[in-house]
């Protein structure tokens, strides 16, 4: 293809202001001439190189000097220098845009490189690799990582430590963040990785980690090199805009749906980090059907198959007023609430309180099948939050100045100025009872097997939703509106995992706790005694080996950072009687322990007896497959089993 520009071959994409990053002399200059725009471009054809209207470089062999000549056109007339310490926020914003432009070009070149390698066009691959190196020649982060690797290889640990402290490179890795100035119960799993011109901290939900999905950018650390050869960092918090809660009013006009519609064609509930949408197909309404006797039997059989000896209390099901909200207790949910004739609001509240005092037992379980391919399915009666996570956020972003303080080897604090506790915690929104009922209906349709979910829906009866489920849904919607919002101070601690997975009692696990969805816990072996054990002043204090599981993500009952269970695992601690558990569950060993439960809002936290189960990973039936561990919480009123699968963090 003929062209008048010596450095240009193939189809061209112009990259405005790409030149700013390629001249070390001009990297400190905030103002560059705009009336002398360079035709800096990159080819996306089979042959590629960089182009300039004044360059005479060989198009078949783009060189570093060619790249810099192309980049230096606009900077030639700029004689004043500026220290990056003097950059104002507008100048930083321009730098952010420039970095994004470079990153898009590098991403394009890497994509071409992968295609060339796949086609075994190694000559083209070499050229593309050289082009990538030239495009990132002034990338401060790439230079820092090279220097760090060289210092470690040459055992210059003092230089390596200095780089880690001064450039943010020591923060690369996995972290868990907990708010310091907010009562929010949820922790954040964050992965900090080096990128083009910056270190990127991405937040991951348990579902994103299980599905190996891309994380959501939470904060960034931009690094630039000053005139003295040192480095300057600028931390920014990535705030997602357009986070308005959009729920169609028509979606909640009715809360009844036929059994087939609720199972096969339910409303689509979509939460994208900070945006909650309910999309409804035409002429589709939420209707409730009449549960059949066979359907109720399917429900009971399904639950009793999970845990032997499970006791269920089933009441009569009759017409329930739409305005009525109802019944579950914490992480366990009622199967069917006792219905009454339409009454006033005060009678409804009294009925709800009476029903919540009934001792109705249920079991929460999880489906660990196909963890890597699909979102895991958990069995939770009345669950409403399992399937409303999503890994993508399409909102526009706004960068807000932040800073990192109290940096240690395995901890640091992210400070976002101006984000007070009052601003974070007081943004509450009213949710109608119709919305709550619709969300609960959707949750049942998604969570239960068809024959089980169908039993809950009929032509005349509707499922009553408890006060606690109402609060759960309100919390979910509030979280959806808050999205990726951080508190003003967030303390991060490094997640240290074992190099191998040979020890079942050391590492990360993912499990489902009641209706709150999947959560991540970290197991660690310890030796000593439990802090709240009785007889602490006694002379015969017993020390023993035990395993402790700490929640990294958390839920409104037991928040992140709390111990969720512990069990003795030393010599003589293994229990021999496995007759209480079905053979299909695959129990290899069991250990006596304790589990922590609490009321909503982490009220009345208490320890209950429990058993830690080591499983063979084969599972039982189509609903529970591949679980590695389980913990049975034995409460005074009800017991429930939580199954865990080992979680391996991506490198």
Curated annotation (Swiss-Prot):
Q: Which UniProt keywords apply?
A: Chloroplast, Plastid, Stress response, Transit peptide
Q: Main location per UniProt?
A: plastid
Q: Residue range of the transit peptide?
A: 1-69
UVR domain sequence ranges: 103-138
Q: Which parts of the sequence are annotated with region: Disordered?
A: 330-359
An annotated GO cellular component = thylakoid membrane
Which superkingdom, per the lineage?
Eukaryota
A Gene Ontology BP annotation from the UniProt entry:
singlet oxygen-mediated programmed cell death
Q: Where in the cell is it found?
A: Plastid, Chloroplast
**A matching Pfam family:** Cyclin_D1_bind
Q: What does this protein do?
A: Together with EX1, enables higher plants to perceive singlet oxygen as a stress signal in plastid that activates a genetically determined nuclear stress response program which triggers a programmed cell death (PCD). This transfer of singlet oxygen-induced stress-related signals from the plastid to the nucleus that triggers genetically controlled PCD pathway is unique to photosynthetic eukaryotes and operates under mild stress conditions, impeding photosystem II (PSII) without causing photooxidative damage of the plant.
- Put simply, this protein is called Protein EXECUTER 2, chloroplastic
Task: Tell me the classification of the organism that encodes this protein.
Answer: Eukaryota, Viridiplantae, Streptophyta, Embryophyta, Tracheophyta
Q: Which gene encodes it?
A: EX2
């Amino acid at each position: 293809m003929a062209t008048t520009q010596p450095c240009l071959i193939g189809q061209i994409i112009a990259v405005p202001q790409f030149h700013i990053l390629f001249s070390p002399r001009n990297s400190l200059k905030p103002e560059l001439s705009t009336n002398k725009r360079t035709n800096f471009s990159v080819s996306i054809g089979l042959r590629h190189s960089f182009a300039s209207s004044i360059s005479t470089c060989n198009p078949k062999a783009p060189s570093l000097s060619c790249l810099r000549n192309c980049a230096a056109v606009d900077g030639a007339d700029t004689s004043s220098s500026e220290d990056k310490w003097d950059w104002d926020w507008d100048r930083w914003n321009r730098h952010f845009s420039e970095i994004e432009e470079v990153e898009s070009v590098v991403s394009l070149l890497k994509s071409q490189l992968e295609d060339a390698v796949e086609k075994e066009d190694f000559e083209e691959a070499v050229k593309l690799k050289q082009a990538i190196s030239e495009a990132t020649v002034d990338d401060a982060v790439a230079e820092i990582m090279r220097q760090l690797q060289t210092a470690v290889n040459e055992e210059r640990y003092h230089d390596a430590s200095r780089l880690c402290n001064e450039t943010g490179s020591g923060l690369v890795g996995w972290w868990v963040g907990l708010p310091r100035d907010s009562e929010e119960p949820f922790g954040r799993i964050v992965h900090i990785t080096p990128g083009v011109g910056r270190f990127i901290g991405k937040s991951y939900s348990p579902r994103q980690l299980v599905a190996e999905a891309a994380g959501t950018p939470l904060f960034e650390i931009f690094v630039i090199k000053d005139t003295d050869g040192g480095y300057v960092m600028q931390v920014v918090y990535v705030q997602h805009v357009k986070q308005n809660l959009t729920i169609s009013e028509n979606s909640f006009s009715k809360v009844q749906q036929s059994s087939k519609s609720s199972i096969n064609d339910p409303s689509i509930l979509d939460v994208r980090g900070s945006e909650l949408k309910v999309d409804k197909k035409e002429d589709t309404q939420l209707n409730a059907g009449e549960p059949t006797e066979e359907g109720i039997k399917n429900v009971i059989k399904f639950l009793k198959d999970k845990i032997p000896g499970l006791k269920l209390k089933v009441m009569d099901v009759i017409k329930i007023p739409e305005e009525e909200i109802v019944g579950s207790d914490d992480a366990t949910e009622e199967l069917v609430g006792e219905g009454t004739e339409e009454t006033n609001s005060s009678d409804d509240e009294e009925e709800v309180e009476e029903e919540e005092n009934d001792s109705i037992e249920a079991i929460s379980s999880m489906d660990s099948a196909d963890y890597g391919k699909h979102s895991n399915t958990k069995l939770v009666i009345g669950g409403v939050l399992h399937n409303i996570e999503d890994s993508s956020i399409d909102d526009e972003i706004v960068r807000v100045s932040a800073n990192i303080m109290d940096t240690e080897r395995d901890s640091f604090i992210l400070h976002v100025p101006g984000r007070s506790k009052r601003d974070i915690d007081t943004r509450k929104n009213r949710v109608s009872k119709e919305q709550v009922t619709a969300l609960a209906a959707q949750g049942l349709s998604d969570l239960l097997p068809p024959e089980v979910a169908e039993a809950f829906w009929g032509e005349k009866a509707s499922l009553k939703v408890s006060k606690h489920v109402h609060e759960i849904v309100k919390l979910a919607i509030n979280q959806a509106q808050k999205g990726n919002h951080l508190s003003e101070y967030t303390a991060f601690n490094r997640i240290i995992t074992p190099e191998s997975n040979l020890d079942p009692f050391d590492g990360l696990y993912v499990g489902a706790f009641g209706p709150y969805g999947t959560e991540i816990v970290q197991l660690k072996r310890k030796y000593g005694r439990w802090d709240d054990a009785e007889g602490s002043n006694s002379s015969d204090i017993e020390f023993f080996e035990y395993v402790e599981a700490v929640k990294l993500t958390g839920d409104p009952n037991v928040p992140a950072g709390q111990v969720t269970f512990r069990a003795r695992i030393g010599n003589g601690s293994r229990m021999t009687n496995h007759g209480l558990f079905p053979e299909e569950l695959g129990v290899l060993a069991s250990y006596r322990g304790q589990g922590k439960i609490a009321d909503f809002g982490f009220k009345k936290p208490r320890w209950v007896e429990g058993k830690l189960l080591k499983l063979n990973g084969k599972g039982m039936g189509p609903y529970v497959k591949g679980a590695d561990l389980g913990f049975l919480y034995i409460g005074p009123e009800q017991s429930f089993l939580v199954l865990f699968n080992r979680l391996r963090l991506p490198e």
